[in-house]
Every structure is written in C-alpha cells, then in structure tokens.
Amino acid sequence: MHLLGPWLLLLEYLAFSDSSKWAFEHPETLYAWEGACVWIPCTYRALDGALESFILFHNPEYNKNTSKFDGTRLYESTKDGEVPSEQKRVQFLGDKSKNCTLSIHPVHVNDSGQLGLRMESKTEKWMERIHLNVSERPFPPHIQLPPEIQESQEVTLTCLLNFSCYGYPIQLQWFLEGVPVGQAAVNSTSLATKSVFTRSELKFSPQWSHHGKIVTCQLHGADGKFLSNDTVQLNVKHTPKLKIEVNPSDAIVREGDSVTMTCEVSSSNPKYTTVSWLKDGTPLKKQNALMLTLQEVTKDQSGKYCCQVSNDVGPGRSEEVFLQVQYAPE
C-alpha cells in the first residue's frame, strides 16, 4: 500500500468533532507499518452522562435501512461487559467520562482506512472517525534543515518520524558521510492528542569542508535492526577558500625578471564575484584577475602579496607570499 507522505505534515492541528453533546480531540491521521502498533491518543466530552457503550469499527458505513452502522467490529464494550477483540489486538485504554485512548498491536496493512469510534451514552449517540495509514514497510523519517546553513554558525538538524507507540521502541540515529555522529542529539517523543511523533534534534557547527557532504538519519528497531532512512546533502554557504601559486616557486627573482602569481579557488559557495590582489595590505590597481603577472620587476616590488576573492558571504584571502627581488649594489 502506498504511504501518503507521512513525513510531509506534522499533525499539529486537532481533529474536532462536535455535536451539541459530544466533543473529541485526537490526531486526524495516524501512521504505522506492518507488524508495528498504533497508539491513538483521544479525549472526549459527553455532557449528558457517562459512556455506556463503545464500539470500534473499521471502515464503518451507515445503513439507512437498519439505522445502524455496518463494518468490521474491532472492539466492543457495553454496559453488560467487554467483547475482546480478535487475538486481543485492540485495547480500549479510556474511561466512561473523558478518555478514549486506544491501542492496536500488532497493526496490519489491511487495517488501513477509517476507524470509527461509536460512542453511546444513556441518551446520545456519536460516530467519531480517525484515519489510519499502515504501510507494508517502515516508512522513512524526514530530515528538516534550516533555510540557510553557513560555515561556523551553529544550526539544528531535525529528524522527524510521524510515529510513536508504547511497547514498540524505535531509535533515530545520525550519520555524516557514513560515520555515526549525534552523541549530543536530543531525542523526544509525543503521544499527545495534538500530535504523534518521534524526533531527534542535532546541533551542528558546519565547516566549509562539510559542503556537499551527505547527512543521514536512520530508523532502527528495538533490536538495532535497520528499518529505513532519509538522506540530505549539505549546502554550506562559505567564503572563497584560496591557495596562491608563484612562479618561480621560491618567489626569489632578480630585477628585470618576470613573476607570475596564480590565485586558485578551491571552493566558493556561492560562486565568487570579485577578485583583487594586495601588496603589503594595499590593493593593487587594475588587478582583478586570478592571475597576476609582474613584468620586469624592480626592487620596489619586493613585499608580501596575497589575493582576495569575495562572494555574497564575504571575502576570502589567501596566505601571503613574500616576493624577494634581488638587485645589484647601487
């Protein structure tokens, strides 16, 4: 069965159903996979008295001829007693006044569809519906990145899975280029009526060398078995990273010789926009190419040279090269 994007939305809203007598709070849709379980946090309000009958239907349909709901009965509890579910998969963990929490363990693909909570008090009846989506295999978590990542600035990476269930422990683990990271990751779960999820947050101070690297969040079962994963490629904004090459390599020449300096841009994100050369900290005029050629040098051109390349993040500067121009005694 195709999973309808469980990572796309964190169910922060409530599903409300309200007649003049009934009100419910629960996640609108719950997600699980074959063999796992579903924990359905649920609260309700019945103003006319205590709950007398509760039936959990699978894909209920109202029959106008009988004025009753038809569908598979997964669980039933009346004032006369409880009717156990098949293999006791379904547990009603609520009460007769405000709690309608349910558990289905194990859950199967054919449980997907609509769950109907048929509630009856002494004078009122209500059918509350909850969507259940069960995939054949464990669905992947989803890595959430901040809008922009910049070198040396701490960011938080979030790995989110729209699943959590008591009695079915899982673990989210972080990897960078296949190497485990995330010893300081903060893990949390929610089984509230507002949302059901498992989350891991990793604080990370990326360097420019992390640009283009692969970050993975893996989902593991209680036995450590790999279940699924999500991967992203880091886009780390950084200033240009430079290296300067000189010919001759020792940067020692005689007056009248020529010198060539090349500014190599090993990395720049985003692409660089300007190039300049400096001698002893002062910009050289009309020198805005990656190659600087000095023809027939004089002793006055001895000094420290470097290149500076800028992008939208800022300027990057190479190491300095000391050019030594030898000359005859005057």
Swiss-Prot record:
Question: Can you tell me which residues are glycosylated?
Answer: 65, 99, 110, 133, 162, 187, 229
Highest taxon, organism lineage: Eukaryota
Q: Which residues form the Ig-like C2-type domain?
A: 141-233, 240-324
Q: In this UniProt entry, which residues form the Extracellular topological domain(s)?
A: 18-330
Membrane topology designation: Single-pass type I membrane protein
Instruction: Give the protein's biological function.
Output: Most highly expressed siglec (sialic acid-binding immunoglobulin-like lectin) on B-cells that plays a role in various aspects of B-cell biology including differentiation, antigen presentation, and trafficking to bone marrow. Binds to alpha 2,6-linked sialic acid residues of surface molecules such as CD22 itself, CD45 and IgM in a cis configuration. Can also bind to ligands on other cells as an adhesion molecule in a trans configuration.
Q: What is this protein called?
A: B-cell receptor CD22
Provenance organism: Pongo pygmaeus
Q: Which gene is the coding source of this polypeptide chain?
A: CD22
